[in-house]
UniProtKB/Swiss-Prot annotation:
This is Small ribosomal subunit protein uS10. GO terms for biological process: translation. Part of the 30S ribosomal subunit. It comes from the Bacteria. Pfam families: Ribosomal_S10. PANTHER family: 30S RIBOSOMAL PROTEIN S10 FAMILY MEMBER (PTHR11700). The keyword Ribonucleoprotein applies. Involved in the binding of tRNA to the ribosomes. GO terms for cellular component: ribonucleoprotein complex; ribosome. Belongs to the universal ribosomal protein uS10 family. Keywords: Ribonucleoprotein, Ribosomal protein. Disulfide bonds: none annotated. The keyword Ribonucleoprotein applies.
Length: 103
């Protein structure tokens, strides 16, 4: 796998889960001899929702809710076959979305 790069993008609602998962990926990649760049924190996406409190009247009384999506980006430069196998066997928490691209 010469001159290749693995780009890993993590998304989660809980920043503690995403930081823990990023640390596991970095440790696994470094243990197999690959060079890791990152994790780079990307901007947090915030979605806000306004919900009416009352089912009938009082339009001015509302609740405001928000969902925060945290993101991290990592590059693994010159991965070996051991690196790819170790990353495939890695068990990450259920709340973390992982996107892997080979470049």
């Amino acid at each position: 796998m010469q001159n290749q790069k693995i780009r890993i993008r993590l998304k989660a609602f809980d920043y503690r889960l995403i930081d823990q998962s990023a640390a596991e990926i970095v440790d696994t990649a470094k243990r197999t001899g690959a060079i890791v760049r990152g994790p780079v924190p990307l901007p947090t996406r915030i979605q806000r929702f306004d919900i009416l409190r009352s089912p009938h009247v009082n339009k001015t009384s509302r609740d405001q809710l928000e969902i925060r999506t945290h993101q991290r980006l990592m590059d693994i430069v010159d991965p070996t076959d051991k690196t790819v196998d170790a990353l495939m066997k890695l068990d990450l928490p259920a709340g973390v979305d992982v996107e892997i691209k080979l470049q």
